[in-house]
Amino acid sequence: FPQPQEPFPQQPQQPFPLQPQQPFPQQPQQPFPQPQQPFRQQAELIIPQQPQQPFPLQPHQPYTQQTIWSMV
């Protein structure tokens, strides 16, 4: 009885951890570099649009201040 109990747990422990370790790191490495390229391109387009928005917002701010003065 003591002899068969030892080999059974030893055998499954080795194959289970070895199998998942290999596929996990290989699979994510490939998809990660692919999406990085499109994300960078999109960010470049969004960056120039951001500064355009605050510029028109700045003149709107004083208008709101004038309305407050008129209310007072």
UniProtKB/Swiss-Prot annotation:
Compositionally biased intervals (Low complexity): 37-50
Region Disordered, annotated ranges: 1-61
Protein keywords: Seed storage protein, Storage protein
Tissue expression profile of the protein: Developing endosperm.
Biased composition (Pro residues): 1-36
Disulphide linkage map: none
Record GO terms (molecular function): nutrient reservoir activity
Biological role stated in the UniProt entry: Sulfur-poor seed storage protein.
Protein name, per record: C-hordein
Organism listed in the record: Hordeum vulgare (Barley)
